[in-house]
Amino acid sequence: MWPFASVPAGAKCRLVETLPENMDFRSDHLTTFECFNEIITLAKKYIYIASFCCNPLSTTRGALIFDKLKEASEKGIKIIVLLDERGKRNLGELQSHCPDINFITVNIDKKNNVGLLLGCFWVSDDERCYVGNASFTGGSIHTIKTLGVYSDYPPLATDLRRRFDTFKAFNSAKNSWLNLCSAACCLPVSTAYHIKNPIGGVFFTDSPEHLLGYSRDLDTDVVIDKLRSAKTSIDIEHLAIVPTTRVDGNSYYWPDIYNSIIEAAINRGVKIRLLVGNWDKNDVYSMATARSLDALCVQNDLSVKVFTIQNNTKLLIVDDEYVHITSANFDGTHYQNHGFVSFNSIDKQLVSEAKKIFERDWVSSHSKSLKI
């Protein structure tokens, strides 16, 4: 019925947030707990989850979500959780707690062993989906600030499920030739919507390049193109901006996003606001990068603030016309090696709502000047 149905604006997407209880503001949006709970409650056939790691039992709300998944699996709903091979620390405990859930570890880069599964998304029944920066952990559900998108528009959910099929093909328990055969089968039908064919003003972008498949857009290409074409404003809320790629313990300069930000400020006079995280998960280069941007653009309209509470929100807004929500840092290692899916939209309402979130965070008491 999809070809004959009108496409709703924004593909029925709603913003989803986790806000820690110690923050001085609340959200008007769906919470991550409510989003995951709704996906589980409405599921009839399957729930597929992709996350670097799986540690929902670390908080009370995370444990409640896992218990609901357990109940769903006991009713015959097919549940598959994809984890990165290096994020399976709690796997034994979870399997013993719920043997009906199928946990699959993946290795998206067996050849070089440097790529990780970073993607954070849920898909159910080809009808509902979540994509954002909330991994399947108790912290992301309850105690760490995150941002994502929920949609119950079937065509969008189906398109995201194709990404799940791609990552699932890299099951670390399979032989390499089986992985290649599986990937060859799923990649040719890898997406229906992209930057040149969004649905309701929405499309996904992907990384890394060797997992793109037919018609998919490389995330770094879209992000850099948007930064380089910015005319009036760039708002960035990220855990880290790191202009390096790490391989085998060595660091290599990767200035693509970093340079695009500087060029926008200096060459075109674009107003830029950068809100970075400052907690123990930060790359050591992150604060140095923020300070260098602040120093290089001291004569330009570029401002940098630091968010003092655990913040895993990864948000980009360009010219108040485009929004990008992802699970990856603006980090060369993430963009060159890791597997993830990002949400993109040019829908005016979604961009406006995301902008309000950025403005709220920017002026909050938790945002401090880099110079303090």
Swiss-Prot record:
Compartment annotation: Virion membrane; Host Golgi apparatus, Host trans-Golgi network; Host endoplasmic reticulum membrane
Modifications the protein undergoes after translation, according to the UniProt entry: Palmitoylated. Attachment of the palmitate moiety is essential for correct intracellular targeting and protein function.
Keyword Membrane: yes
Keyword tags: Host endoplasmic reticulum, Host Golgi apparatus, Host membrane, Host-virus interaction, Hydrolase, Late protein, Lipoprotein, Membrane, Palmitate, Viral budding, Viral budding via the host ESCRT complexes, Viral envelope protein, Viral release from host cell, Virion
Induction field: Expressed in the intermediate phase of the viral replicative cycle.
An individual GO BP term: viral budding via host ESCRT complex
A single MF term (Gene Ontology): phospholipase D activity
PANTHER family tied to this protein: GM01519P-RELATED (PTHR10185:SF17), PHOSPHOLIPASE D - RELATED (PTHR10185)
Protein task: Major envelope protein that plays a role in the biogenesis of the viral double membrane and in egress of virus from the host cell. Produces the wrapped form of virus that is required for cell-to-cell spread. Acts as a lipase with broad specificity including phospholipase C, phospholipase A, and triacylglycerol lipase activities.
Protein family per UniProt: Belongs to the orthopoxvirus OPG057 family.
Name of the protein: Envelope phospholipase OPG057
Gene name of the encoded protein: OPG057
